[in-house]
Amino acid sequence: MRKLLVYMKDYKKESFLAPLFKLLEATFELIVPLVIAQIIDVGIQTGNTGFIISRCLLLVGFGVVGMISAITAQYFAAKAAVGFATGLRHSLFQKINELSFSLLDRVGTSTLLTRITNDVNQVQNGVNLVLRLFMRSPFIVFGACVMAFTIDPGSALLFLIVVALLSVVVFGIMLLTIKRYKAIQNQLDSVLNTTRENLNGARVIRAFCGEDTETEKFIGQNSLLSKLQKSTGRISALLNPVTFILINVGITLLIHYGAVQVNTGILTQGQVVALYNYMSQILVELIKLANLIITVTKSFASAARIRDVLELDTNTVYSDDKKIYNTHAVEFDRVSMHYNEGAKDALENISFTAEPGEIIGVIGGTGSGKTTLVGLIPRFYDASSGTIRVDGRNVNSYSLEELREKVHVVLQRAVLFRGTLRENLLWGNKNANDEEMQAAVKAAQAADFVQSKGGLDMKITAEGRNLSGGQRQRLSIARALVGNPAILILDDSASALDYVTEKALRGALSALPNKPTVFIVSQRTSSLRHADKILVLDNGALVGCGTHDALLENCSVYREIYDSQFGGKEAAAK
């Protein structure tokens, strides 16, 4: 939690004034029982109406000043807590945007979503309550004990015993629950992950009648969450009844002791009432303090989870080797890659070159490493061994910004953002003019439907839900083309296009004036047969590299893929 306090640095004044005004309010509260004692012992005993009225007005004044102090404290506490949470949320969001693909895979989007929403809210609530109660409640408990000593030391000893017992209960429950709250948050991540997975795959689940299976899976996750919450709740639920029992026993003993002291003339009735009020104040404040500790316990658990994300190592490793070794657009030299330490290589000993302006096809079975291979070029992931060069230079010697200006990628899942088409295309080149954007739209074979929907000002809903799959893919390609990249990667990003549109797209890519090197990842040999070079992957190994005709002759994996799509040798002969 201490590491997160840096986000309070802009709210030092509010963090000082909030507890200060709460202490002012508490001071007036501690004086009230003494005034009431005076009303009983002086005003009522002597029948002095003027004294009673003056002291009642004094109580009203204390109440008004206390209320103003409380409102002011609440304002400063809320301002500091909201500002703290806003800064923390900004840093967390920025950190998430800096995470590499491998870290995103490892942590999980559902977990990150929980951290930036629920966990930040928990910490915000904790900060708010701490600023308002952390000093006020102990101050009143301590002050009430001191006041009790000034009235009667014997009664004050009873106060100290009750406070000591309550402290054991409160801190004992806190220690028992703090780890449980962290477990609850982790299980909540699992529930959210299951929910997210089901929502994203709803159509597939229903297509295969998997609702019952997925429901059972969710019930299992949710039941575990419920079990953790109930076990923690049972412990937390002991807090209020145990504190009430201890306080009420203390009050009972106090009243009995006070009655004896009044009968012997040691204490007055007003003093006993004052002692009772101080005991009641201790009760109220200890309950507040107990609830504060529960909230702070949750906040500490959430703060630890937030800190784990903020401390993730996102430092990209760069190479000092900026030497240009050759004129190849892309070169892989004995490249291997695995996603996790100790895991099997997703790619193993890959070597090939791509020349400027070439169209390179990448094909292979499911899980063969196609997406992994092209993802290494813009450094979505880093190679475990070997060297990758872009324009003859080690890819690790480029800054990510410089590299990704050269390399534009269209991913398997076409992602568009809410706004206009123009706003989406500017992601590819923030300085692009309308003419350049229209040229990119035309090259992506999207001009017809874009024109019919309002041109560059056409509205796009979140994730492009108002467009078909093929339309989203074409606009994603247009966005990549706007930047005039030196290297364009199409990762199975034309799968939703019909053959006619796909053929027109291939022709447009070949005719681009800047002649980029194009990598086309596809499952369809028809999409790659005109490529200058085709890379054939099988279980992470490069088993073939050449033209379509050459691979049909000498690569059994490619031949098998081709035959499965076109019916064997007869189709090949044609």
Name each region found by the language model:
Residues I324-K574:
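ABC-type nucleotide-binding domain
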Residues L20-F21, E25-A37, D41, I53, ...:
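Juxtamembrane helix-loop junctions of ABC transporter transmembrane domains
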Residues T46-G47, V82, H90-T114, N118-V120, ...:
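Short intracellular "coupling" helices and adjacent cytoplasmic loop segments at the cytosolic face
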Residues M1-E29, I36, I44-L58, A73-A77, ...:
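Membrane-integrated ABC transporters
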Residues L59-A70, V163-S167, S236-G250, H256, ...:
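Hydrophobic alpha-helical segments in the permease module
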Residues D10, E14-T27, L59-F62, I68, ...:
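Transmembrane helices of ABC transporter permease
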Residues K9-K13, F101-S102, N118-L131, M135, ...:
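An intracellular "coupling" helix at the cytosolic face of ABC transporter transmembrane type-1 domains
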